[in-house]
Amino acid sequence: MADIAKLVEELSKLTVLEAADLAKALEEAWGVSAAAAVAVAAAPAAAAEAAEEKTEFDVILTGDGGKKIQVIKEVRAITNLGLTEAKALVEGAPKAIKEGVSKAEAEDIKKKIEEAGGTVEVK
């Protein structure tokens, strides 16, 4: 037990940088990773945060509202698609216009498409 007390005393004298270097050296010597245990423990918390507030949204065109030409023009402006691609997207509704965008951008796209006469769903 005297050896353990002596070891604790010596380790207590280490700076943070020296302790980090010690941890890396022990990981290499023993072939283990201290980060793996931390990542497993943190995973449920991260999943709970994702469920609380979604940060990426998909904008889905659900219909052209009878104003296909105006909606095609707006889809082209938003997505930088060519005329035939934008027309195929509008005619193939429901289809995603943009995926993985911020809430503000999704709401902006929704507003523009609805002003053109189309119907949009943000998921």
Swiss-Prot record:
| Annotated Gene Ontology cellular component terms | cytoplasm; ribonucleoprotein complex; ribosome
Q: What's the superkingdom here?
A: Bacteria
Q: Name one GO molecular function term.
A: mRNA binding
Coiled-coil spans are none
The record ties this protein, via Pfam families, to: Ribosomal_L12 (PF00542), Ribosomal_L12_N (PF16320)
Q: Does the keyword Ribosomal protein apply?
A: yes
Name the InterPro entries on file.
Ribosomal_bL12, Ribosomal_bL12_C, Ribosomal_bL12_C/ClpS-like, Ribosomal_bL12_oligo, Ribosomal_bL12_oligo_N_sf
Q: How does it assemble?
A: Homodimer. Part of the ribosomal stalk of the 50S ribosomal subunit. Forms a multimeric L10(L12)X complex, where L10 forms an elongated spine to which 2 to 4 L12 dimers bind in a sequential fashion. Binds GTP-bound translation factors.
Can you tell me which family this protein belongs to? Belongs to the bacterial ribosomal protein bL12 family.
Name of the protein in its database record: Large ribosomal subunit protein bL12
Organism of origin is Novosphingobium aromaticivorans (strain ATCC 700278 / DSM 12444 / CCUG 56034 / CIP 105152 / NBRC 16084 / F199)
